[in-house]
Amino acid sequence: MLATNTYLSTQDVFPEKSQTARGLYDLLLSELCKLGSIHEIKKAISISFSSDNQKAFAWVILRNRSIKLVFRTNHRIASQRIQSVTHVAEKNYDHTILLDSKTAIDDELMKWLGEAYQTSK
């Protein structure tokens, strides 16, 4: 289930982005909805996703032909796919990954996002 709390319309968020970025976002959103109840909050430069308690577990920053995805877990994930890891608080790590093709939204990524979703509850 998807609930949208928005400050901007989808058209405002994607005005000059390519169809590639839009397609990646739509696929990511579809996969996130399989995790459970998702709240989508659209802002000027990013879109955040939270579980029912409104604690964000992932953020996307839209680029012209890709998406920069940041997600938070309670442990550090070691993978060459992850561009950076920031230790933001005790047992909170933000991981950044670049999504530039639909194949990047795979089982491994969804496992990580599932962990992030569960951590946010």
Each language-model region and where it sits:
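Charge-dense, helix-prone N-terminal extensions
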Residues: 1-121
